[in-house]
UniProtKB/Swiss-Prot annotation:
EC nos: 2.1.1.192
The protein's name in its UniProt record: Dual-specificity RNA methyltransferase RlmN
Catalytic activity: adenosine(2503) in 23S rRNA + 2 reduced [2Fe-2S]-[ferredoxin] + 2 S-adenosyl-L-methionine = 2-methyladenosine(2503) in 23S rRNA + 5'-deoxyadenosine + L-methionine + 2 oxidized [2Fe-2S]-[ferredoxin] + S-adenosyl-L-homocysteine; adenosine(37) in tRNA + 2 reduced [2Fe-2S]-[ferredoxin] + 2 S-adenosyl-L-methionine = 2-methyladenosine(37) in tRNA + 5'-deoxyadenosine + L-methionine + 2 oxidized [2Fe-2S]-[ferredoxin] + S-adenosyl-L-homocysteine
Family to which this protein belongs: Belongs to the radical SAM superfamily. RlmN family.
Cofactor: [4Fe-4S] cluster
GO cellular component: cytoplasm
InterPro entries the record matches: Aldolase_TIM, Methyltransferase_A, RlmN_N, RNA_MTrfase_RlmN, rRNA_lsu_MTrfase_RlmN/Cfr, rSAM
Record has Iron as a keyword: yes
Organism from which the protein derives: Klebsiella pneumoniae (strain 342)
Length: 388
């Protein structure tokens, strides 16, 4: 089967039936201007409405006081601003907040991580995940569907609404967004890219492209396409120093091996300004699986031609997982080897693990609709991005 990369189009402008309303959260600025053009309005109306939507977290047309009453009435007839609702909130002792967010009859999870100098939101891109990484709780839930643009950017909107809109508080509620929640973002490009465009847009959330990070496990055809679509920071879920280990814990490696993956990564960062010439390597530490000093030496040799910084992630356990968490001493020895080679190496501080909000622990509530044949194809054959 040949790879098919799905790119953003104007599908969001299509109303499924005459009684349905267009959810304006599904539209990036280009699509929003097309929407107002079709209403017979000037393009600047799109900018006005987006400013209300994202700077004030406003979802009521009647509150948009610089828009005339007639147009507000028209908007109420054909459009809505409907973000997914929070159905459960958990707060960690370290300040981390995890929200379970309803998307249809299921849930995804979004995590807010406040720090002294920043506030990061971890956003989901799919209901579940089809890649079956063995150390990840989300992967064990199976896969159901891709999230729509409104369900992705809606997580950011809802979090900002709860924490406090910038125009209301005077403080930016979210400084960084990481596409590291449930799902593989590159298997949902047609929705993830427009959502990230809204994150970057001055009339959207206005984030710097260096503060929006997409993390991928290695869907190479989509990564090759991504650089022509948008420029954001890139993090890669490597987790192994060789193909033998990675084949076992990250099954997509059987299709796109480490060499192929890193070649694609170098191609992306060579034309990216957001990455400042280097990529973030994510490496989960699994006890006596990939955490020996011999693995550290091997990883250093592997990455010698890839400008990068390395995040070592203490593994966060979940019920039934076949792994153990590396000891602090093993992580420390691993880190020291990498630093001796000159790599910037950071041991990620675990946040929110007491509420299962830490890396690899997000599970949501997923009805698994992944066909077994599709899973096997993803491990050993070409991936049809459109089919997932």
């Amino acid at each position: 089967m040949s790879e098919q990369i799905v790119t953003p189009d104007t599908a969001a402008l299509t109303v499924p039936n005459k009684d349905a309303k267009i959810n304006l959260l599904d539209l990036n600025r280009q699509q929003m201007r097309e929407f107002f053009k079709n209403m017979g309005e000037k393009p600047f109306r799109a900018d006005q409405v987006m400013k209300w939507m994202y700077h004030y977290c406003c979802d009521d047309f009647d509150e948009m006081t610089d828009i005339n009453k007639v147009l507000r009435g028209k908007l109420k007839e054909v459009a809505e601003i409907r973000a997914p609702e929070v159905v459960e909130e958990q707060r960690s002792t370290d300040g981390t907040i995890k929200w379970a967010i309803a998307v249809g009859d299921q849930r995804v999870e979004t995590v807010y991580i406040p720090e002294e100098d920043r506030a990061t939101l971890c956003v989901s891109s799919q209901v579940g995940c089809a890649l079956e990484c063995k150390f990840c709780s989300t992967a064990q839930q199976g896969f159901n569907r891709n999230l729509r643009v409104s369900e992705i950017i809606g997580q950011v909107w809802r979090a900002a609404k709860i924490v406090g809109a910038v125009k209301t508080t005077g403080v930016r509620p979210i400084t960084n967004v990481v596409m590291m929640g449930m799902g593989e973002p590159l298997l949902n490009l047609n929705n993830v890219v427009p959502a990230m465009e809204i994150m970057l847009d001055d009339f959207g959330f206005g984030l710097s492209k260096r503060r929006v990070t997409l993390s991928t496990s290695g869907v190479v055809p989509a990564l090759d396409k991504l650089g022509d679509m948008i420029d954001v920071a890139l993090a890669i879920s490597l987790h192994a120093p060789n193909d033998t280990i990675r084949d076992e814990i990250v099954p997509i490696n059987k299709k796109y091996n480490i060499e192929t993956f890193l070649n694609s990564v170098r191609g992306y960062i060579s034309k990216s300004n957001a990455n400042q010439g280097r990529v973030t390597i994510e490496y989960v530490m699994l006890d006596h699986v990939n955490d020996g000093t011999e693995h550290a030496h091997e990883l250093a040799a592997l990455l010698k031609d890839t400008p990068c910084k390395i995040n070592l992630i203490p593994w966060n356990p979940f019920p039934g997982a076949p792994y153990g968490r590396s000891s602090n001493s093993r992580i420390d020895r691993f880190s020291k080897v990498l630093m001796e080679y000159g790599f910037t190496t950071i041991v990620r501080k675990t946040r929110g693990d007491d509420i299962d909000a830490a890396c690899g622990q997000l599970a949501g509530d997923v009805i698994d609709r992944t066909k077994r044949t599709l899973r096997k194809r993803m491990q050993g054959e070409a991936i049809d991005v459109k089919a997932v």
